[in-house]
UniProtKB/Swiss-Prot annotation:
Protein name: Maturase K
Major location (coarse): plastid
Function: Usually encoded in the trnK tRNA gene intron. Probably assists in splicing its own and other chloroplast group II introns.
A GO CC term assigned to this protein in UniProt: chloroplast
An annotated Gene Ontology molecular function: RNA binding
Alphabetical keyword list: Chloroplast, mRNA processing, Plastid, RNA-binding, tRNA processing
Family of the protein in this entry: Belongs to the intron maturase 2 family. MatK subfamily.
Biological process, per Gene Ontology: mRNA processing; RNA splicing; tRNA processing
The organism's taxonomic lineage, starting at the top: Eukaryota, Viridiplantae, Streptophyta, Embryophyta, Tracheophyta
Subcellular location: Plastid, Chloroplast
Natural source organism: Solanum lycopersicum
Length: 509
């Protein structure tokens, strides 16, 4: 019982009571501004819509308004006359949300560092490597090729904003910060603006995106931590009480009656967690639960997850959000890649005395490919080509210098080769490179009021040498032995640990 309480109750180092004063510090908003610029920098080099009116003068005005306690006593029925944000309501609300998101991430960052320090003789890992999107793919390569079925799950969202506050309350023991969070959510936000459910999945509103992503991820993390705890401690929980477990599930709610009802059915459902080979991955509002079990086994997991999230976490969920697929004959959009598990047939000649025969050894392999249609769609949306992939000029860049135009196109091309370096077949990337190169030439020709052929003949082909330094040539210089031939570079898959966000061209939607 004490072991369960130690897991469910955070220690004193994880309970922070000093977060609220940070909302009045100027450097917090500077950190949030820097984070926002780095996060919103798109691979297409377009303006991401971040408000350029940010300045320390506005920060000082905002802090002065918040420091006056009379402005914090606000009627929820009279939001239009609220003097707190004044005429800059949109800008101030965005700044508060980004600053608050930067502050409340502190407890989770401390928890991450403390958990990483327990590995490899108390040596702290480089957490920025674990943040890389590409760090997920080696895990899938090592584990998914041995599994049979996978549950593709669209993660549900909470039905009320107060649930988000109650979730964060478990980790942040700071009443002032939580009151500010509750005020901000109910006064300036609503569930419709937070989550747009027009698509089968979900999407967050672009305004205050970092703030809402943090709230949503903290809530899903709470659900997942309880789920993983049940999975790892199934044999131990058979002989223990479940009061502390339910207390955490319901976030300090009144659950005396539920304890009795849940305890009766708990022994029946607990055997489901005895699967020794189970892997879970979450990404982009979706998750994957892969197992070596059979189809009936995965079907039981499906209905258990629906009941688990819907009954115990107040999440709107139905069976249509979970699909059972066989890994050997199913492809999925995963982090901008088209991933699948395919069979590679290896023929081995064996000889016994005078007789020889061939042995066919099928080997499962996790494969990642570049999706050409979504990529061309993203390029067409950014006005680099038509919907059919025919290159066109970029008129909005015609006012830039020739070097700036070439640099922008070259940077996009290098970023694409960098992100999709994990693909086993890079032929698609050379088609994208051709589109960008010809689009660059047409943009330059449009600027100089000339045709593409005339412009290249007058300027020389060396003007577009920016595109010749592709990812493969960089790899051949970095790994001369492994990349001694062009075919070896073409077939090799390289995963990087410096890619922290997905941009427009890498979005599976």
């Amino acid at each position: 019982m004490e072991e369960i309480h130690r897991y469910l109750q955070p220690d004193s180092s994880q309970q922070h009571n000093f977060l609220y004063p940070l909302i009045f510090q100027e450097y917090i908003y500077a950190l949030a501004q820097d984070h926002g610029l780095n996060r919103n920098r798109s691979i297409l080099l377009e303006n991401s819509g971040y408000n350029n009116k940010f300045s320390f003068l506005i920060v000082k005005r905002l802090i002065t308004r918040m420091d006056q306690q009379n402005h914090l006593i606000i009627s929820t029925n009279d939001s239009n006359k609220n003097p707190f944000l004044g005429c800059n309501k949109s800008l101030y609300s965005q700044m508060i949300s980004e600053g608050f998101a930067c502050i409340v991430e502190i407890p989770f960052s401390i928890r991450l560092i403390s958990s990483l320090s327990s590995f490899e003789g108390k040596k702290i890992f480089k957490s920025h490597n674990l943040r890389s999107i590409h760090s997920t793919f080696p895990f899938l390569e090592d584990n998914f090729s041995h599994l049979n079925y996978v549950l593709d799950i669209l993660i549900p969202y909470p039905v009320h904003l107060e649930i988000l506050v109650q979730t964060l309350r478990y980790w942040v023991k700071d009443a002032s910060s939580l009151h500010l969070l509750r005020f901000f959510l109910h006064e300036y936000c609503n569930l419709n603006s937070l989550i747009t459910s027009k698509k089968p999945g979900y999407s967050f509103s672009k305004k205050n995106q970092r703030f809402f992503f943090f709230l949503y991820n903290s809530y899903v993390y709470e659900c997942e931590s309880t789920f993983v705890f049940l999975r790892n401690q199934s044999s131990h929980l058979r002989s223990t009480s479940f009061g502390a477990l339910l207390e955490r599930i319901y976030f300090y709610g009144k659950i005396e009656r539920l304890v009795e009802a849940f305890a009766k059915d708990f022994q029946v459902t607990l055997w489901l967690f005895k699967d020794p080979v189970m892997h879970y991955v979450r990404y982009e509002g979706k998750s994957i639960l892969a197992s070596k079990g059979t189809f009936p086994w995965m079907n039981k997991w499906k209905f258990y997850l629906v009941n688990f999230w819907q009954c115990h976490f107040s999440m709107y969920f139905n069976t249509g959000r979970i699909h059972i697929n066989q890994l050997s004959n199913h492809s999925r959009d995963f982090m901008g890649y088209l991933s699948s598990v395919r069979l590679n047939h290896s023929m081995v000649r064996s000889q016994m005395l005078e007789n020889s025969f061939l042995i066919n050894n099928p080997i499962k392999k996790f494969d990642t490919l570049v999706p050409i249609i979504p990529l061309i769609g993203s390029l067409a949306k950014a006005h680099f080509c038509t919907g059919l992939g025919h290159p066109i000029s970029k008129p909005v860049w015609s006012d830039l210098s020739d070097s700036d135009i070439i640099d922008r196109f070259g940077r996009i091309c290098r970023n694409l080769f960098h992100y999709y370096s994990g693909s086993s077949k890079k032929k698609t990337l050379y088609r994208i490179k051709y589109i960008l190169r010809l689009s660059c030439a047409r943009t330059l020709a449009r600027k100089h009021k000339s045709t593409v052929r005339t412009f290249l003949k007058r300027s020389g082909s060396e003007l577009l040498e920016e595109f010749l330094t592709s990812e493969e040539e960089v790899l051949s210089l970095t790994f001369p032995r492994a990349s001694s031939s062009l075919w070896g570079v073409y077939r090799s898959r390289i995963w990087y640990l410096d890619i922290f966000c997905i941009n427009d061209l890498a979005n599976s939607q």
